C-alpha cells in the first residue's frame, strides 16, 4: 500500500522538504550490517598480510554472503543484504572508491566502545567525482542473483551528508580546501558522484 512520507533534509544551513510516494513490500526492515564470521575475518587479515590474493578473498566473501542470505531468508527477512561483508568500514570503503579521495594507514585510533578503532586517514587529493563504475555496483549484482518472489535486495551506502561531513568538518577541510573554495562546491560534486553510483545500481 502506498505510503506518503515527508522527508526533511537539513544541509549547509538550509532546510528542504520532500514528499515521496513509497510503495514498500513489507512493514519492517533492518539496517543491513551483520557480524562477520571468524573465517571471513581471518581471510581478510591474511589478505592484508599478503598471504592470499584478492580473488581468494573474494571467494571467501562470496561464501560468507551466500550463507548470510540463506539465514536471512530462513528468518523471514524480505530485504536481504550482503551484511557489508566486503567492507572494512561501513562508510569509508564507499568513499575511497571515488575519484579524488585517498587514504593511508594510521596508528591513531578513534574511540569506539572503549576500544580504539584503527581507521585509515581519509583525505582529498583532487576534485571528488565518479568517472568509472563503483565497486559496490558489482557487489550489488552478485547479491541480485538471490532475489525471489519473497525478497528484494537492499544495497547499503552511507548518506551523502556523511560523505560531506568527512571533509567539511575542520579536520577534513584542511585538505579539502586545497581543491574547493566553499563547502557548497564540495557538496555539489559529492551529489553528482552519488547520482552516477545510484544510476549504475
How would you label these PLM feature ranges?
Residues 16-200:
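Domain-level signal for soluble alpha/beta catalytic cores
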Amino acid at each position: 500500500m502506498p505510503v506518503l512520507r515527508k522527508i526533511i533534509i537539513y544541509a549547509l544551513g538550509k532546510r528542504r522538504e520532500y514528499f515521496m510516494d513509497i510503495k514498500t513490500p513489507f512493514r519492517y526492515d533492518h539496517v543491513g550490517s551483520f557480524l562477520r564470521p571468524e573465517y571471513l575475518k581471518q581471510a581478510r587479515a591474511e589478505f592484508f598480510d599478503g598471504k592470499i590474493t584478492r580473488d581468494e578473498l573474494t571467494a571467501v566473501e562470496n561464501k560468507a554472503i551466500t550463507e548470510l542470505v540463506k539465514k536471512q531468508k530462513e528468518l523471514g527477512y524480505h530485504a536481504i543484504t550482503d551484511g557489508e561483508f566486503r567492507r572494512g568500514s561501513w562508510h569509508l570503503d564507499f568513499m575511497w572508491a571515488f575519484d579524488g579521495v585517498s587514504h593511508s594507514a594510521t596508528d591513531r585510533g578513534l574511540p569506539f566502545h572503549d576500544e580504539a578503532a584503527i581507521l585509515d586517514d581519509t583525505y582529498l587529493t583532487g576534485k571528488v567525482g565518479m568517472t568509472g563504475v563503483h565497486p559496490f555496483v558489482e557487489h550489488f549484482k552478485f547479491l541480485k542473483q538471490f532475489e525471489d518472489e519473497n525478497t528484494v535486495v537492499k544495497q547499503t551506502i552511507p548518506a551523502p551528508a556523511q560523505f560531506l561531513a568527512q571533509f567539511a568538518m575542520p579536520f577534513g577541510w584542511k585538505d579539502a580546501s586545497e581543491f574547493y573554495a566553499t563547502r557548497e562546491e564540495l557538496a555539489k560534486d559529492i551529489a553528482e558522484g552519488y547520482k552516477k553510483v545510484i544510476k549504475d545500481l
